[in-house]
Amino acid sequence: MSLITELPAIFDSFSDARRQGFLAVMALKERQIPLVGTYCTFMPQEVAMAAGAVVVSLCSTSDETIEEAEKDLPRNLCPLIKSSYGFGKTDKCPYFYFSDLVVGETTCDGKKKMYEYMAEFKPVHVMQLPNRADDEASRTLWRSEIVRFKELLEQQFGNPISEQALREAIVLKNRERRALADFYRLGQLNPPALSGTDILKVVYGATFRFDKEQLISELQEMTRRIKAEYAEGKRLDARPRILITGCPIGGAADKVVRLIEEHGGWVVGYENCTGAKATEQCVNEEGDLFDALTDKYLAIGCSCISPNHQRMKLLSQMVEEYQADGVIDVILQACHTYAVESLAIKRHVRERHGIPYMAVETDYSSADKGQLATRLAAFIEML
């Protein structure tokens, strides 16, 4: 297939930051490197990397393009879905524009149907995720989906994926996971070494980086420097320690984190897809690689999996390791699985760990900032 290498017609109207994003990814494409876009942590990036492609997260956390998306999609739909579609439709996301393939997944009904419309203007491959993660039938299905994805990439880009290439990709991706985990585990320090806002900025921003070796090096150096400064006494004041769980956040949804920290708390950890859920577990580098990929990705504790034992397990681990004083469940409007699962999370946090829990529902607008501030301030004061 021919790769996309030219800038969109509306390039000149973009802000300088976004122009730089387009130019950076265009430089990559001029080297004839395929770009695979993704929205979800279930996408097995190692397979695309082994095919010689660069994998990048796509824009989906701003209300900038939601109005355009609502011309095609229902208004009462999850903002992440509308934002994803809107950025693709309007050519305002450099990473989507230059993607040669977008990989979706069946994590929710809204996404599944949205991908059908997205496929009208971009090649889209949807991976069929099982509803369970704890039985052999589900494992067999997901393994076959990973193999099917491999075969599609080989056909799409004309580059056979060898076992050696896949193993090397797994090793590299694991190194990235460990570097990210070492960085975000700085939140375990008490009192904190840095704010949750800064942690999120780095972890979320890492999903848009192309050069993994450079990213790993920068993360390791940043972690080393922060630990050294902490040992010398550079640290934040003691405040109530908050653990975030729930829907993916970043971009506009990071308003919740900022409000928590503006009203007397510190966000010390992220259990959600933006944080530990994606990186806490690595892929086994030995044995059958497709079995190893299957096991790693089915261990992601997403609310689309039922029953969702992995989320409870990771949440308990993080409550203890991060010495959390409270848990805040961030739910995007119209995200039914996370909204329904909030009762189970509330029971788990309160009964198992004996600490306060609160769920907040939000979207990508700023309209609810006042209401959120009031609720979050009251919760933190209670701690």
Language-model features: locations:
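An N-terminal, globular interaction/scaffold subdomain
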Residues: L35-K89, D100, T107, M114
